[in-house]
């Protein structure tokens, strides 16, 4: 947690492969792509996150004396290799899609160009960092979409799978759209709003509910949200909250950020009845917050039922992405450049499952926007040296079905390259935005999606296609591999 050197945050086989390369030197430079194949939670997109922590990992990548001593104790690694590790630094290039960007399956989120030993070592940590935060940012985006503009508070720390998942999950949740977090350490580390009310234990520690409410309101008159379901929401909690609000008003205390929170029961019914009671007392502007094992589906249902809730505390199902607890990012070799060569040789991984056949070569990703609407038409994976003129018509190819291709008419679209340089020759060339800036950027990104692609259930797919050049390279490699298999 908050570690600066995570060099041993790797799988053992990365190190054993490194030693193999060291003992059998080829001096190859390679390209690895980090991408995913299936959108989380049945959606049509993901939100990429974790780049800042990935950069910190790369910048602090080095083996301490105690790391070398530990590796020596495993009786696997030879002394000359351990000596090499003692001076190891990352010297390659990394390109990445910025955090908060809407992304789709099979397009590279991160591209690593480096000597093969360096590129191999960083695989595990890159996947660990990007997979986790992208998952939670995506879940948060879905939850926020379901809330239809209401504020979402991230409340999941106590249910997260450990401190790091709580800290960085909360960071990712804010990038995905949450207004803030209950996690104070995340607030301190990333300068994001920290939010919270009080627990049932606060109410229970006082002789009665009214006294508990009154004491809390006196202490926090400018941020007074009272938890009303400790005993009985409508017979006790809301009446006592109204009594306290009335007394504060009579005392000349201006109520600004105030309201109630309901943490159990029929949230639709209780919120409607509570609103009637608050409105009758002149507090129709009070916030009604809800918690209680919420997720995007329940929030969407409550909004459809016209529940009088305008603030939501979401914990377990957000911080764990409970219905889809893993982001399936992978890290695959795409090209190799031998010592003395000036060009990369494309590499392809085959599979009986066409979805798992990789896209070869040194690639980049362009987003194609409709010029008239600003919405995404498709994403295009192409070779890194390709140049396109938006005034010219372009043919793009479905990566799985060779019979499907799309014509994009010149003059009707705009292009944006998504992969940006982050590390060059081991040196940082990228400035990470603040988390709240990423949150605003992420909102704008999601607005480039068609409404049909933002549906929580059965959304319209956004297509990721290949350029003619990449399509031809992939087709030729597949044919070569098929011929070799027949020999």
Language-model regions: role of each:
Residues 1-222, 249-250, 256, 332-487:
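Ordered alpha/beta subdomains of enzyme catalytic regions
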Residues 201-381:
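Glycine-rich phosphate/ribose-binding loops and adjacent secondary-structure elements
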